[in-house]
Structure formats: structure tokens, C-alpha cells
């Protein structure tokens, strides 16, 4: 399993949520219904990791340049994304064009 920095996760969050939102919601629902024992929601947790990893691999494969620019800006601004609108816009456009269609 690949590992990502905090800034990479922040930069990718909207794209990952757009594709994996239903999986995330199923996991949260399970946690609310069954409590905090991780084994009770293992299937849902595995689905979250699997979906997220698939999306992030496609982002790295297709939008690496835009991701790097967004991450650099986020890191330079103490993990704040507001000053990085231009970089985030370029990343989101790449995601919408090259990554999202693979999951529709």
C-alpha cells in the first residue's frame, strides 16, 4: 500500500470523496451503529482503503504535475488551501478530465 503525506491527502480529498463518498458513508454508518470496535466494520474499512487507493493511484498516474504543485502550495501555506486556489483549480480540472471518468 502506498503512503501519502498529509499535504497529498489534503490536496486529493475532494477527488477521493467524489468517487468514494458512498463507501465512506457506509463505513461511518457502520461505526455509528456498531461502535468503535474496528473488527465489526472491517469489511467497510477495507472498502474505504481499496477505493481510496484506486483513486489516488489514478491521480498520481494522470495528474502528478498538478498534484505536486498543489501539494507544494499547501505545504508552503501551513496546510491551508485557501491561498492555493489557482493550483487546486488546475488539479481539479485535471482530475475531472482524466481521473473521474474512469470511475463513472
From Swiss-Prot:
User: Which Cys-Cys disulfides exist here?
Assistant: 20-51, 30-41, 63-94, 73-84
Q: Where is this motif: Cx9C motif 2?
A: 41-51
Record keyword Ribonucleoprotein present: no
Is Disulfide bond among the key words of this record?
yes
The Gene Ontology biological process terms listed for this entry are:
mitochondrial electron transport, NADH to ubiquinone; negative regulation of DNA-templated transcription
Subcellular location(s) per record: Mitochondrion inner membrane; Mitochondrion intermembrane space
Q: Which cellular components does GO assign to this protein?
A: mitochondrial inner membrane; mitochondrial intermembrane space; respiratory chain complex I
Its membrane topology: Peripheral membrane protein
- According to its UniProt record, where is this protein mainly located? mitochondrion
The short motif Cx9C motif 4 is annotated over 84-94
| Residues of the CHCH domain | 17-59, 60-102
Motif Cx9C motif 3 located where? 63-73
Family assignment from sequence similarity: Belongs to the complex I NDUFA8 subunit family.
General function of this protein: Accessory subunit of the mitochondrial membrane respiratory chain NADH dehydrogenase (Complex I), that is believed not to be involved in catalysis. Complex I functions in the transfer of electrons from NADH to the respiratory chain. The immediate electron acceptor for the enzyme is believed to be ubiquinone.
**Subunit record text:** Complex I is composed of about 45 different subunits.
The protein's name in its UniProt record: NADH dehydrogenase [ubiquinone] 1 alpha subcomplex subunit 8
Q: What gene name is listed for this protein?
A: ndufa8
